[in-house]
Amino acid sequence: QKTLYSIADEGVVSFRILENGALQKLNTQNIRGMRGCHLAIDQFDQYLMVSGYHDGKATLLALNPDGSVGPIVDGVFDKGIGSVAERTFRPHVSCARMTDDQKYILVADLGIDQVRVFRFDKADGRMRQIDTIRCELKSAPRHFRFSPDRKFLYLMYEVKNVIDVFRFTEGKKPNDINLEKIQ
């Protein structure tokens, strides 16, 4: 079954896409925050990440087997002060994505010029921050993607107008990761 997720004033709305292309509303789920700006689904269709530009919040929700949106699993607010007073004087989460193995969630914040890295524990559903990529001031990290083999992270910026490439490696310990900028 195909499912469409949309941001709405009240949170997130899920729709089943019917064979004729029509949409059938499944449900609406509140995110306990301001309207999001970006949605991402994990590889196994188990989780939905909502990026909150206006309130600096990344919200993780469960997805039900029928495609409807389940309850909030966890959520984190970014804190800090940005580098451009006219626009980025506070956190603005622009992208949140889970790695394909569901171990990590990365959260890009163009307001404070950072990408925060969280370890995701499926057992208790918690996101625990383990690292931060501190980007160049006034660069505004906007979106990112991993390479299919997850060896590289491609980070795109809104203001800087470049793509940085990071080598992603894991150590032997659960929270031992390294994101080395190589380009």
Region locations from a protein language model:
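Short loop/turn segments immediately following beta-strands, especially the blade-tip
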Residues: F15-G21, L60-G70, R119-R126, F166-D176
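Structural signal for beta-propeller blades
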Residues: V12-S14, G56-L60, D113-V115, N161-I163
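Residue-level detector of Asp-centered blade-edge/turn motifs that repeat once per structural unit
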Residues: Q1, Q43-D45, D100-D101, P148-R150
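Short loop/turn segments immediately following the C-termini of beta-strands
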Residues: D9, Y53, L63, L110-G111, ...
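Asp-box/WD-like beta-propeller blade repeats and closely related beta-sheet repeat scaffolds
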Residues: Q24-C95
